[in-house]
Amino acid sequence: MYKPQQQQQLFDLQDNNGAAFDNGGTDPSCWLSHENEISRTDSSLSSSNVDPLLFNDLVQIVPLVQSLIDRKEKSSFTRRGSMTYTKMPSRESLYKKTSEVKGRNAGQSTATKKHRDQNKNVSSSQDGYAENFSTPSSTSSLTEKDREELMTLREKVEDLQKKLLEKDELLKEAEILKNEITATNAELDEMKKDISEKDFLVKTTQVQLSDALVKLADKKAAVEKLEWEAMTSSKKVERLQEDLDLLQGEISSFIQFVHALTGNDSRDSAEECNVIPYPWDQNVEIDKLNERDLQKMEAAREAYIAAVAAAKENPDEASLSAASTARSYLQSLVLRT
């Protein structure tokens, strides 16, 4: 609550401000001349039960009103504004208001910040503070020019707000575009990485394909060599077959010739048996010798046929050599006989 001394100081401060206003607001130091008194009043209020925020709000209103009156005079107002004082509030209302202000912790900081901003932007908050005081003479004396200026200012403010909103939208779009570009760059880097890996894989595959082609060429050459060897072996087998056929013909002819000789010898021996009583043993030895040679020749022929058959199935050097050896042995037997 207000003490009598504090109330008197507050009214003295208001009287001094009113006197400054009555002088037309031409003395810019009228407010500065009372700074010491305000500071003393503020220090005295801080030691009392009065809320200092409420008192500071009341004190800050005074220079705003003074600046409003100065502005109205400078805009070709010939009539000076006068300040109307309201009735001093009662103790109960002040106590109630003080209690409400103390209970609003968040509201106090917001109100303080708001009044500080209003001190910095006096021109934008003059109408709000002028409504708290009754200045009918100032508001009623607005000219058409001031209204036009006010409308122009409002239009400019609206245009500025629209431009600000447009810029905000542009900034948001730019931010979205920036994010999209960042995401696109990330995807591009990922694609480049994938392409590099695929290029490496393609190069590796090409190297492997080249090695496979070289191996295939080697195998093709080996196959051609085997085909040539097989063709050569086939030719050798054909020659051996021809020789075998020729030899078989010769052997057949020789066997027929031997059988013919054997038949003639048998007949001659039979005739001689009738005439000569003792040539039987010699003929028996000749027959035995002929049968032994025939058995050797038959065995050599069968061995040669088997060697030729083995050479046909597996035409290698060993089988061909065995067939040639069997043939030579058979020829030697035939020629020796």
Swiss-Prot record:
<dbReference type="GO" id="GO:0046740">
    <property type="term" value="P:transport of virus in host, cell to cell"/>
</dbReference>
<feature type="compositionally biased region" description="Basic and acidic residues">
    <location>
        <begin position="89"/>
        <end position="103"/>
    </location>
</feature>
<keyword id="KW-0611">Plant defense</keyword>
<dbReference type="GO" id="GO:0003723">
    <property type="term" value="F:RNA binding"/>
</dbReference>
<feature type="region of interest" description="Disordered">
    <location>
        <begin position="80"/>
        <end position="147"/>
    </location>
</feature>
<dbReference type="GO" id="GO:0008017">
    <property type="term" value="F:microtubule binding"/>
</dbReference>
<keyword id="KW-0963">Cytoplasm</keyword>
<dbReference type="InterPro" id="IPR040289">
    <property type="entry name" value="MBP2C"/>
</dbReference>
<keyword id="KW-0175">Coiled coil</keyword>
<keyword id="KW-0945">Host-virus interaction</keyword>
<feature type="coiled-coil region">
    <location>
        <begin position="223"/>
        <end position="250"/>
    </location>
</feature>
<protein>
    <recommendedName>
        <fullName>Protein MICROTUBULE BINDING PROTEIN 2C</fullName>
    </recommendedName>
</protein>
<dbReference type="GO" id="GO:0051493">
    <property type="term" value="P:regulation of cytoskeleton organization"/>
</dbReference>
<keyword id="KW-0206">Cytoskeleton</keyword>
<dbReference type="GO" id="GO:0006952">
    <property type="term" value="P:defense response"/>
</dbReference>
<comment type="function">
    <text>Prevents homeodomain proteins (e.g. STM) association to plasmodesmata and, consequently, cell-to-cell transport. Binds to RNA. Alters KN1 RNA-binding capacity. Regulates cytoskeleton (e.g. actin) organization that determinates cell shape. Interferes with cell-to-cell transport of tobacco mosaic virus movement protein (TMV-MP) by mediating its accumulation at microtubules, thus interfering with cell-to-cell virus movement.</text>
</comment>
<dbReference type="GO" id="GO:0015630">
    <property type="term" value="C:microtubule cytoskeleton"/>
</dbReference>
<keyword id="KW-0694">RNA-binding</keyword>
<dbReference type="GO" id="GO:0002230">
    <property type="term" value="P:positive regulation of defense response to virus by host"/>
</dbReference>
<dbReference type="GO" id="GO:0005737">
    <property type="term" value="C:cytoplasm"/>
</dbReference>
<comment type="similarity">
    <text>Belongs to the microtubule binding protein 2C family.</text>
</comment>
<comment type="subunit">
    <text>Interacts with KN-1. Binds to tobacco mosaic virus movement protein (TMV-MP) at microtubules.</text>
</comment>
<feature type="compositionally biased region" description="Polar residues">
    <location>
        <begin position="120"/>
        <end position="142"/>
    </location>
</feature>
<feature type="coiled-coil region">
    <location>
        <begin position="143"/>
        <end position="194"/>
    </location>
</feature>
<dbReference type="GO" id="GO:0051224">
    <property type="term" value="P:negative regulation of protein transport"/>
</dbReference>
<dbReference type="GO" id="GO:0010497">
    <property type="term" value="P:plasmodesmata-mediated intercellular transport"/>
</dbReference>
<feature type="coiled-coil region">
    <location>
        <begin position="294"/>
        <end position="314"/>
    </location>
</feature>
